[in-house]
């Protein structure tokens, strides 16, 4: 009986440690980490720290596709699918981030 209780306890502990309530991948790639750093350093002044929520000035961008992210960063123009939170809000183009677009996409695609 003690042996069965011990095995049940082990299985229960294994199941609990296997649960992941996070929206981030269990294994974060370097690209994911770079994207997270860039987002939390440069984007949260307008977007929310949680990309699924609207920010102070800008809408949520969770799960945005690569082309949309690229276009917004390179031109700053609003596109179908992401509407400005304020009618006159404009995003400044950030062409210096061109090489980091894949990193931002890697991070944002985890928030769907």
Please report, for each region that a protein language model flagged, where it lies by residue.
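Short acidic/histidine- and often glycine-rich active-site loop of Leloir-type glycosyltransferases
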Residues: 53-54, 72
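Short microdomains enriched in Cys/His and/or Lys/Arg
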Residues: 65-76
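The canonical Cys-X-X-Cys-His
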Residues: 35, 39-49, 91, 104, ...
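Electrostatic cytochrome c docking/interface patches
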Residues: 19-38, 54-57
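Sec-dependent bacterial lipoprotein signal peptides
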Residues: 1-18
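Axial heme c-ligation environment in periplasmic c-type cytochrome domains
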Residues: 54-62, 77-111
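Sequence context surrounding c-type heme c attachment/ligation sites in exported
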Residues: 33-40, 62-67
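A mature extracytoplasmic/lumenal domain signature
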Residues: 50-51, 65
């Amino acid at each position: 009986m003690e042996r069965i209780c011990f095995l049940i306890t082990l299985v229960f502990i294994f199941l609990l440690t296997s649960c992941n309530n996070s929206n981030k991948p269990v294994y974060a790639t370097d690209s994911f980490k770079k994207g997270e750093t860039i987002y939390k350093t440069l984007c949260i002044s307008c977007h929310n720290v949680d990309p699924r929520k609207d920010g102070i000035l800008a809408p949520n961008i969770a799960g945005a596709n690569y082309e949309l992210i690229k276009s917004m960063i390179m031109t700053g123009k609003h596109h179908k699918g992401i509407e400005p939170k304020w009618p006159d809000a404009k995003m400044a183009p950030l062409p210096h981030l061109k090489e980091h677009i894949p990193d931002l996409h890697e991070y944002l695609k985890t928030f769907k």
